[in-house]
Design a protein with these regions (language model features):
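Active-site/ligand-binding-proximal alpha/beta "capping" segment
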Residues: 118, 124-142
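PRPP-dependent phosphoribosyltransferase catalytic core
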Residues: 4, 134-181
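Short glycine-rich phosphate-binding loop at a beta-alpha junction
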Residues: 52-59
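Active-site-facing substrate-recognition patch
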Residues: 1-51
Length: 181
């Protein structure tokens, strides 16, 4: 299974091309069913022994991967969104400022989507500053549930880990770490 994983990492790396502003287009990665399937299997191998009752991501780009991971683990998916869903009465919400942008973002999740006894795996396609993932961790805490781990395809450096304030021994699994260009 390790050689398959090494193949996954090099496949992802080969598709990362930064533009002159230091951004990259991840469409090729998050839209590739083969990559998503391999990544979901990798998450399954890493988190199968852990208690996971929900997979949690933020809209939009993390959804394809989180869907595949939730399916592989046989658990439900919860998506934090930037807008309040019509028909939902109560929400948990978390507001944060996007680093270096001055833009404030609020993520909303239906209040009963994550229960007190849930053990939540946070999944995202990419972690850059960790702001979004920290907001997801805070939403899990507001629901009085526990974070069972973090899983991502790509992470830029490792500075972001400090922001998450994860409990001791909480696993963080990233397929490939890249340096900021």
């Amino acid at each position: 299974i390790l050689s398959k994983f090494v193949g996954l990492e090099s496949e992802i790396r080969s598709r990362i091309k930064f533009d002159e502003d230091g951004y990259f287009d991840n469409t090729d990665i998050i839209g590739d069913f083969n990559i998503l399937q391999q990544a979901a299997n990798h998450a399954l191998a890493n988190f199968a022994g852990k208690r996971v009752t929900k997979v949690f991501t933020a809209a939009v780009d993390g959804i394809p991967l989180a869907t595949m991971v939730a399916n592989a683990l046989g658990v439900n998916l919860v998506i934090a969104k930037r807008g309040k869903e019509v028909g939902v009465k109560e929400f948990l919400e978390e507001t944060f400022v996007l680093k270096d942008s001055g833009v404030t973002i609020t993520l909303y999740v239906p209040k009963d989507a994550i229960k007190k006894r849930d053990s939540v795996l946070i999944v995202d396609d990419m972690i850059k500053t960790g702001e979004t993932q920290a907001a997801l961790v805070n939403l899990v805490r507001k629901a009085k549930a526990e974070v069972s781990g973090i899983f991502s395809l790509i992470a830029v450096g490792e500075e972001w880990k400090k922001k998450l304030k994860l409990p001791e021994g909480c696993p963080v699994e990233v397929v490939t770490y890249i340096k900021q260009p």
